Swiss-Prot record:
Annotated source species: Rattus norvegicus (Rat)
GO annotation terms (biological process): decidualization; embryo implantation; microtubule bundle formation; microtubule polymerization; positive regulation of protein polymerization
Alphabetically ordered keywords of this record: Acetylation, Cytoplasm, Cytoskeleton, Microtubule
Stored Gene3D superfamilies: EF-hand
Keyword Cytoplasm listed: yes
Protein name per UniProt: Tubulin polymerization-promoting protein family member 3
């Protein structure tokens, strides 16, 4: 088997990939998407000896029949199956050690994640102080939205007769 430092690094990598993309995940179980990401990011799936399909098949083999996730023990079984396929010329133990070294200490890569742009047009379009017309009514001085009060004129239905609307506004209309 792999050295104890490799096993600790392997378990740490398992936990990091298990919680990737899921804020509610505990890190004890990994889903198929994160398993495929681990194999791709750690170069276990090279596209030649081990493909994405092989990764998915091994995941299905090691998980329980009705389960959608694997735990750490099933993860190690899956790695053993992939190790013999990835490193064909080596013994089972050497192949497992080699695959553990590929994964140990790694964490999910965020390559291809879109960053927020800050260009001239974006600044101009998102600066609420530069809005004109009815759009500037939708935000207060700090730039925070007013909600429905900024989008609609809300009618005051507080008259003492059903047809009398906007109570208290007569004096403003008729100037003395």
């Amino acid at each position: 088997m792999a050295a104890s430092t490799d096993i600790a690094g392997l378990e740490e990598s398992f936990r990091k990939f298990a919680i990737h993309g899921d804020p509610k995940a505990s890190g004890q179980e990994m889903n198929g998407k994160n398993w495929a990401k681990l194999c791709k990011d750690c170069k276990v799936a090279d596209g030649k000896a081990v493909t994405g399909t092989d990764v998915d098949i091994v995941f299905s083999k090691v998980k329980a029949k009705s389960a959608r996730v694997i735990n750490y023990e099933e993860f190690k079984k899956a790695l053993e199956e992939l190790a013999t396929k990835r490193f064909k010329g080596k013994t089972k133990e050497e192949a497992f050690d080699a695959i553990c070294q590929l994964i140990a200490g790694k964490e999910p890569a965020n390559i291809g994640v879109t960053k927020a742009k800050t260009g001239g047009a974006v600044d101009r379009l998102t600066d609420t102080s530069k809005y004109t017309g009815s759009h500037k009514e939708r935000f207060d001085e700090s730039g925070k939205g007013k909600g429905i009060a900024g989008r609609q004129d809300i009618l005051d239905d507080s008259g003492y007769v059903s047809a009398y609307k906007n109570a208290g506004t007569y004096d403003a209309k008729v100037k003395k």
